[in-house]
């Protein structure tokens, strides 16, 4: 019934590899395959002799194995290796062919004989035996499985189980609850040797803003001396949409806050976000629903914010409900982007691809939010006025805008720990509804990818100022993927109150003793050691970044974040006529591209020229004409092609979009080697100064900051073959497209020489 094909001769060798005798036949071997399960994870259903399709029109390279559905993931287990795949970064929670249930967007079953197909929903019946299963994922992957050799009833059961468990109707049915329950009942359970929610360098240093002290430290770090930490919402007595502790003007008493809270939507009072060194503050609040008291309460709140400013400057109000796209518009644009990136066949849509991308409006929305944040940065930095972000509920687009403003103005948030603390402060603790917006419970009417849009905006800044960020594009992509893993409490709830309430109810039902804890303790996504090894976590470190020590807090005051005029961090020795990508004069100094500029003078016309028709545009013009200090303010360039598509995130599973030995990773590889070698030399120099007469050796573990290191060049053969524009992700094995394997394009992608040389042509003659 079932047989595995013998390997065919490859292009490099016409000899079959030696076959080792195996006492177990292929059928028995597949039946004995077992899934690797986490604590609390159970196998719901499984089916043997499943074929995972590597491409849609050939079975030569397909994989045979077992398809397993658990309460956490869909897992395909095989003993075969994926063809042409030389590297795949390893997630310690998920196997190479695993997909979390919360990452599944749509399930389609097909019967070839009856020519039927159906989209499976929760608790639906299936009247035919499926011969094929297609899974559309939220990260733009498409997985295809064939049941030609599998039992028809087993195939039907696993499809129904997958539809049922991937579309839960209750929050407590998500896997994180079962995982944590096992941890509390059996403390000996650990994942990768680490307790849930603890461990990891970044996790230990990332403030979660769940305590009074975290907010107090942030006040002192920013020098907000006229602001105080308020505990009026302790126990969520005032609002379930606010954290227990938050920051308010010192002039507003707790009694005033209690009185004003009833007038705001969701009782979300003004919430302090950040303070500039000049005294201006960034504040968020919901709309005032009581129209009769709107003017009165608004004036009192603004008066309190004004008194907290050393210059007593007027408050600038920004109505985000009218200034930026709605969450519905953002969802519609993202749906068009997803359809464009997963559409097949790719070659038939290539001609109109760019116009379709423009019509999706996703990049235009990215530009809109970056521009809005830059305008508010101008108000805070140049006008020295406090800014109040007002939104209907104050917990959606205000999260995005507030985060971008702080990212542009404060270099601390461009470090890994600072960026994680920013997300904790402005998204998690400020009650951004991750449960609804990520659609973990399949309530599509509330879904909107605001957090994805935020990461995209951050990526745009990272591309424009690669030396200003401690983290890399890989870090942002992995963070994007982590929102689809239903294990971390970080992206699982609509608010901190919901986490406490739901976990407390679950603990009572499961007879879990919480003690003094407020609800169950879920693993934090910032504990990256739960997902990746120390080696893989090195991909998060940007070799271009030059860190700066955190400013010391003295009497509530910190050093200014202002840029210095004499420092250019974009390129040493850059001519004064070119600053921050802005051309000031026509007489360029000799550069590598000077010949191109002379041959094509029209290129100069593509350089963005800002007409100073307003204060903001004059501010931009002045900023772009000065050398940038990447430890100070950074502003986005919004013109022309400066806003790009985040290809690593959206097109990493599309083989037609890959560049073998190309993309930014090639430069990243060289820079990492150079940075690693510099660190090694510095380490040896420090050791020599300490022990000048001793033999200088390489300290173990001291030069591990970079993923690529000089000491591995000689030990790894063909290490450059793993470098593609989708690194460290591999599109092979995640396809639902016309096969390109064995074609000239396939050979080119895999490094083969497909063009004939002049010597070859001469010899043939």
Curated annotation (Swiss-Prot):
Q: Domain of life here?
A: Eukaryota
One GO cellular-component annotation of the UniProt record comes to:
membrane
Myotubularin phosphatase domain location is 209-650
List the Pfam families: 3-PAP, Myotub-related
Any GO molecular function: phosphatidylinositol-3-phosphate phosphatase activity
Q: What PROSITE patterns does the entry give?
A: PPASE_MYOTUBULARIN (PS51339)
Q: What is the official name of this protein in its record?
A: Myotubularin-related protein 10-A
Naturally occurring in which organism (per UniProt): Xenopus laevis (African clawed frog)
Name of the coding gene: mtmr10-a
């Amino acid at each position: 019934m079932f047989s595995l094909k013998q390997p065919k001769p490859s292009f490099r060798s016409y000899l079959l590899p030696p076959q080792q005798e195996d006492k177990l036949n292929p059928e028995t071997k597949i039946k004995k395959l077992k899934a690797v399960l986490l604590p609390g994870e159970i196998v719901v259903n499984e089916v043997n002799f499943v074929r995972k399709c590597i491409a849609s029109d050939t079975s030569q390279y397909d994989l045979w194995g077992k398809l397993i559905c658990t309460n956490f993931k869909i897992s395909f287990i095989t003993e075969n290796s994926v063809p042409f795949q030389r590297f795949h970064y390893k997630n310690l929670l998920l196997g190479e062919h695993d997909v979390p249930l919360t990452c599944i967007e749509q399930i389609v079953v097909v019967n070839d004989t009856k020519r039927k197909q159906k989209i499976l929903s929760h608790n639906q019946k299936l009247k035919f035996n499926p011969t094929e299963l297609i899974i559309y994922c939220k990260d733009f992957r498409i997985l295809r499985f064939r049941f030609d050799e599998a039992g028809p009833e087993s195939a039907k059961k696993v499809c129904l189980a997958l539809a049922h468990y991937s579309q839960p109707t209750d929050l407590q049915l998500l896997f994180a609850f079962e995982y944590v329950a096992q941890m509390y009942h059996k403390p000996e359970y650990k994942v990768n040797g680490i307790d849930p929610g603890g461990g990891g360098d970044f996790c230990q240093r990332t403030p979660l803003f769940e305590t009074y002290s975290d907010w107090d430290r942030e006040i002192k770090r920013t020098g907000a001396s006229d602001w105080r930490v308020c505990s009026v919402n302790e126990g969520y007595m005032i609002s379930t949409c606010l954290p227990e502790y938050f920051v308010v003007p010192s002039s507003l008493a707790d009694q005033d806050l209690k009185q004003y809270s009833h007038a705001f939507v969701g009782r979300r009072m003004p919430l302090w976000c950040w303070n500039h060194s000049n005294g201006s503050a960034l504040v968020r609040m919901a709309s005032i629903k009581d129209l009769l008291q709107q003017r009165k309460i608004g004036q009192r709140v603004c008066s309190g914010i004004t008194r907290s400013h050393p210059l007593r400057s007027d408050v600038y109000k920004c109505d985000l409900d009218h200034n930026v796209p709605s969450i519905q518009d953002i969802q519609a644009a993202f749906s068009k982007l997803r359809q464009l990136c997963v559409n097949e066949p790719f070659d038939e849509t290539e001609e109109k691809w760019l116009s379709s991308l423009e019509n999706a409006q996703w990049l235009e929305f990215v530009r809109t939010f970056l521009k809005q944040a830059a305008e508010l940065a101008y108000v805070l930095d140049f006008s020295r006025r406090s800014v109040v972000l007002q939104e209907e509920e104050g917990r959606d687009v205000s999260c995005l805008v507030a985060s971008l403003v702080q990212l542009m103005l404060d270099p601390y948030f461009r470090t890994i720990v600072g960026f994680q603390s920013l997300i904790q402060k402005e998204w998690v603790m400020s009650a951004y509804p991750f449960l609804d917006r990520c659609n973990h419970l399949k309530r599509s009417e509330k879904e909107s990818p605001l957090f994805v849009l935020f990461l995209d905006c951050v990526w745009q800044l990272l591309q424009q100022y690669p030396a200003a960020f401690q983290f890399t594009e890989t870090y942002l992509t992995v963070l994007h993927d982590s929102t689809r893993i239903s294990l971390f409490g970080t992206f699982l709830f609509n608010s901190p109150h919901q986490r406490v309430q739901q976990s407390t109810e679950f603990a009572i039902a499961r007879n879990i003793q919480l003690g003094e804890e407020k609800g169950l303790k879920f693993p934090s996504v910032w504990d990256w050691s739960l997902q990746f090894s120390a080696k893989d976590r090195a991909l998060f470190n940007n070799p271009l970044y030059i860190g700066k020590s955190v400013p010391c807090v003295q009497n509530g005051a910190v050093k200014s974040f202002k840029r210095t005029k004499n420092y250019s961090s974009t390129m040493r020795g850059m001519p004064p006529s070119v600053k921050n990508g802005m051309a000031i004069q026509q007489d360029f100094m000799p550069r590598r591209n000077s010949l191109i500029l002379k041959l094509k003078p029209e290129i100069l016309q593509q350089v963005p020229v800002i007409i100073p028709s307003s204060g903001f545009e004059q501010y931009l013009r002045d900023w772009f004409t000065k050398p940038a200090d990447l430890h100070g303010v950074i502003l986005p360039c919004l013109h022309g092609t400066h806003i790009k598509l985040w290809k690593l995130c959206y097109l990493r599973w599309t083989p037609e979009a890959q560049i073998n030995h190309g993309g930014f990773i090639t430069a990243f590889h060289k820079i990492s080697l150079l940075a690693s070698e510099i660190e090694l030399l510095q380490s040896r120099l420090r050791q020599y100064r300490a022990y000048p007469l001793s033999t200088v050796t390489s300290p173990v573990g001291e030069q591990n900051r970079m993923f690529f290191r000089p000491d591995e060049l000689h030990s790894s053969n063909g290490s450059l073959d793993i470098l593609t524009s989708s690194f460290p992700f591999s599109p092979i094995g995640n396809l639902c497209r016309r096969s390109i394997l064995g074609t000239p394009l396939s050979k080119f992608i895999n490094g083969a020489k497909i063009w004939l040389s002049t010597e070859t042509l001469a010899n043939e003659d």
